[in-house]
C-alpha cells in the first residue's frame, strides 16, 4: 500500500542533525542522525560550519527516506526544529556564509553585552524582548559579525547580506533561496524582536547597528513556508510547513498549549518552560519571557528557566570523580541507601542559572560526616537536579500565579526512575513521562502536519499521545519541607564563592 503518508521532522541540534519519520499515528518509524564538527577558535568561543549543518541535515533527510523504504511522494510535509539563538549571516546572491555560525554557547560578545548594560539598555531589553542581556542571544552575535568580518557592514548596508537562525538557514536552503523566513519562537530569541507587538524592534536594531533588510519575515510556527524538491530538480515537491525552536517544539510535543502547563527537559542542562497563554508575564525572579505556540501554532507566551547542570553533574561523577562507570549506574548506587545521610551536592560548576543568576557561585558538597559514602554522594547529586527544578518551578508559579497540576518530562535523565520519583516527591506534583521520547521532533512534526491537514486538529493528536508512566508524589509533607530547607541552606553557602573578598 503506497498511499500511506508520513511526516518528517528535521531536528537540527547543537551536536548532531537528525531526521525523524513519523506515521499518521504519531509513531516514530525511522531515525537518521549525523554528528558534525564543534569549532573552538579560542576559550569561550563556539562555532559551527553552516555548510556542514546543511550537509548533515540534508543527508539525514535523504537517508531516513531510504532507510524506511518509502518514496518521496509519501511525505506529506516537513517540519523543522532547531538549536536556538545560533547565528548565521550569508550572501543573498551566492548563498555563501560570510563567517561560521556563532553558536548559542559562545561567549565572545560579553564586551558588547557589558556595554549594553553600562549604557542603561537593560530595562528596555527586558520589557521589549522578554530577555536578559546576555551573549546567549543572537543580536550581539550579528553585531560581532558585522563589526569583525571585513566589508560585512558595507555589504549589509547595501542589502546584500541575510541573517538567520538555524531554522531560517535550513528553509532558505531547502527552498533554494525562495523563502527567507523564521517563526515567532525563534525570533523571540534574537533580542531584536518586540514580543508584544510581534514585530522586529527598530530601536534594538538601531542600538546594535543592524540593517532591517537582513532580517527574515516572521511567520506562525504552523504554516506552509515553501516547497522543497527531494531528489533534485524535477523531483517531488514537498511543503516545508512547521517550525519552532527546540524548547518550544518540545513544549508543543508534550501538548502543553494552555496556560499553567509545563515541561522540563533533562539534558546536559535542564530547560523548563511554563505556558502562560496570552499573557506575557514579566518575571520578578530572573526567568525569561518567551514566545511559545497555542494549539493552532500561533504565538502565545511562556516563562523559561534554565539550569546549567543537569545530566552534566552525573557526567562529572563519571569522568572526574570516577565513582560511577556510566550514567545508568547512578540509579543503582542512589537506591542502595534510604536517604543522603544529610549530604547535599550543589553542582554550581559554572555558576548558577535561574532563579539565582550568580556567575560567582561554585560547586560544593555539604553535610559530610564520617558515615558518608559513595552512594550518598551519587544520590545527593541526582537529588540536586530535582531541587534545582523546584527552584525554577517556584519562581514560575510565583510569577504567573498558576499552580502546576503535573510536570511533563523528556530528555536522557528521565530514564532514571529514582530521579523522576524524587522529582515528584520534592515538587508534591505528579511527573508524567511520555511513551514517545523524541518530543522535540514530535512538536515539529505536529506543527507541520496540522498546517497541511495531515492531522485535522490537536484533539486528534491528544488521543495518540500516551503517558508511559506517572510518578505520584509521596504524601510526607514534613520530610519534603525539611529536605528542601537543607538544599536552600546549602545553595546559600555556595553563592558568591568566587567573589574577591576585600
UniProtKB/Swiss-Prot annotation:
Pathway membership: Polyol metabolism; glycerol degradation via glycerol kinase pathway; sn-glycerol 3-phosphate from glycerol: step 1/1
Pfam families: FGGY_C, FGGY_N
Regulation of this protein's activity per its record: Inhibited by fructose 1,6-bisphosphate (FBP).
Residue sites binding ADP per the record: 14, 18, 268, 311, 412, 416
UniProt keywords, alphabetically: ATP-binding, Glycerol metabolism, Kinase, Nucleotide-binding, Transferase
InterPro entries named among the record's database cross-references: ATPase_NBD, Carb_kinase_FGGY, Carb_kinase_FGGY_CS, FGGY_C, FGGY_N, Glycerol_kin
Designated name of the protein: Glycerol kinase
Gene name of the record: glpK
